[in-house]
């Protein structure tokens, strides 16, 4: 593995003719927004570009241009293509890209912002001080004088905004706001993006009401937990955004924990914090992320996983 500079990244992209873009499994707004924007940018530079995700693109992100160009692994297994570069966006570990890595032997490049990055790629461009990979892509386009179209601006604004809580989280910096402003200048409409992403159906609201009943507090109300059981996960799938923020906003709470029952003996966890390093907590269980936002999977039933987390915190 070698960490590369912005100039080395630019040179590698200039030399590549055929590029495959991918992101992590269970893709979020930053992953999808960054990928489709980078896709459009690279096509604009005359490159042959493909997109693959070893998962389903969440419905709420399909309003973005070029999401219909994203294929699953099975598509490329039956329609193989030759590539010069596998570009991994917003993924901090090799395991997070699923089966994608096994399909090609091309050099792996990684553009990421997670402090927990395992440096799995052949070439890594890491910016842990950036709030989102979308912020990195916007910054690259600016520094390389690549035009940001309206559709790119929309995708990149969504990428940035969703990874910093629409600019409410502590990872929001002056540069974050500057890059978001460039997206708006390109034609992104923050109100439309926010309304599209945050729209709530009546059925989801009914489920939220039920989930609220699972909220519990620990350690003098400084830790709060909220739970999604197997039934709720069947209904929601990976669309669990927002649940952890319900408890994060409680004034006494420093650590908010969302526990999602994936199986009888497997619990997926999302951690948010106002002060404690939750990346360290997640790393204890084999996960990672950021200082104030991280995640992990614990091979225990939900209630046991909850107790294990509270003991570590």
Regions found by a protein language model. Give the residues of each.
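Active-site cofactor/cluster-binding pocket
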Residues: 65, 71-123
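Short alpha-helices
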Residues: 111-179
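Hydrophobic helix-and-loop "lid/oligomerization" segment in the mid-to-C-terminal part
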Residues: 2-25, 33-62, 77-84, 162-284, ...
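Short glycine/serine/threonine-rich phosphate/pyrophosphate-binding segments
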Residues: 29-35, 94-97
């Amino acid at each position: 593995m070698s960490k590369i500079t912005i100039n080395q990244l630019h040179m590698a992209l200039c030399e590549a003719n055929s590029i495959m873009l991918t992101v992590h499994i269970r893709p979020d707004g930053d992953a999808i927004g960054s990928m489709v924007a980078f896709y459009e940018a690279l096509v604009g530079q005359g490159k042959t570009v493909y997109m693959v995700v070893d998962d389903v693109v969440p419905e709420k992100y399909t309003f973005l241009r070029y999401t219909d160009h994203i294929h699953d692994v099975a598509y490329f297994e039956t329609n193989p293509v030759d590539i010069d570069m596998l570009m991994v966006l917003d993924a901090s570990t090799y395991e997070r890209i699923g089966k994608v890595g096994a399909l090609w032997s091309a050099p792996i490049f990684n553009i990421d912002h997670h402090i927990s990055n395992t440096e799995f790629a052949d070439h890594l461009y890491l910016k842990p001080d950036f709030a989102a990979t979308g912020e990195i892509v916007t910054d690259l386009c600016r520094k390389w004088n690549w035009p940001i179209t309206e559709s790119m601006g929309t995708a990149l604004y969504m990428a940035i905004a969703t990874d910093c809580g629409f600019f409410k989280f502590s990872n929001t910096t002056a540069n974050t706001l500057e890059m978001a402003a460039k997206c708006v200048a390109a034609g992104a409409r923050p109100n439309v993006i926010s309304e599209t992403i945050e729209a709530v159906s009546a059925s989801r609201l009914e489920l939220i009401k039920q989930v609220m009943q699972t909220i519990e507090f620990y350690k003098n109300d400084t830790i709060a937990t909220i739970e999604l059981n197997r039934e709720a996960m069947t209904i929601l799938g990976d669309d669990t955004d927002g649940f952890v923020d319900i408890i994060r906003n409680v004034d006494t709470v420093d650590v908010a924990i969302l526990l999602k029952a994936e199986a009888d003996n497997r619990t997926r966890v999302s951690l948010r914090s106002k002060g404690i390093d939750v990346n360290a907590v997640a790393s204890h269980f084999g996960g990672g992320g950021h200082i104030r936002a991280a995640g992990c999977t614990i091979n225990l039933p939900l209630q046991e996983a909850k107790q294990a987390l509270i003991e570590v915190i």
